[in-house]
Amino acid sequence: RGTDDLPLARLCRSIPVVRIGETDSELPSADVICDNEGGIAALVDHLVDVHGVTEMSFIGELTTYDMHRRFEAFQSRAAERGIAMGRPLLDDSVASSKEWLVNLCEAIDAEQLPRALVCGNDQTALAVIDLLRDAGVRVPQDVIVTGFDGILASASAPVTLTTVRQPLGAMGRLAAKLLDEQRGVPWDEPGVHRMPVKLVLGNSCGCV
């Protein structure tokens, strides 16, 4: 978005700009992102190969670069594995209206929950688990829930999350290193730095 006085495109041509968690091939910036595709593929493969899941849905708000990439990666990997994809429980509203919550409640009431819910991030996954518990749906016995990001709460919640941990510390250090190396000189062209992720198993899939 840039600053209040300078649009991002002009800002990138005035000073070196590093963006974390998003990328744009049109802007001369250094973009540090995580391997969303690899992380989602690892989650889907784990659910299929270890837990025998044959139906799953993606749930979350499609309001960021990461969430869009994760949803697209989910659709692609699930199709490759021949998985039946339930109705996506999504919210693509920029107003963050939590439409996915309404969709999830409707699925619970209609008894149309899939075997697994792949959530776009950990915050969503933790909220989903709370909602399912209040509705009498057991995790992971009735529904498996997974997250993404590896935030601290994912490991300390009553039901620990199976999630994908992105290396936020390493991403921040790389961003600082890239800026330091530029010494105030803006980049001439876009650059993307993709960081590896790690599958972390928890109670929410039944592995721990």
Kindly label every feature range from the protein language model:
Residues 41-83, 87, 191-205:
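An alpha-beta-alpha
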Residues 20, 58-61, 118-119, 146:
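Short hydrophobic segments within beta-strands
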Residues 7-15, 75-76, 128-137:
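Glycosyltransferases and closely related glycan-assembly transferases
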Residues 79-118:
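C-terminal regulatory
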Residues 30-58, 97-106, 125, 166-184:
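Hydrophobic alpha-helical segments within soluble ligand-binding/sensing domains
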Residues 20, 32, 59, 89-91, ...:
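Hydrophobic residues at beta-strand termini and immediately following loops
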Residues 1-38, 123, 149-161:
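Flexible loop/hinge segments that line or gate small-molecule binding clefts
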Residues 105-208:
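Flexible loop/turn connectors
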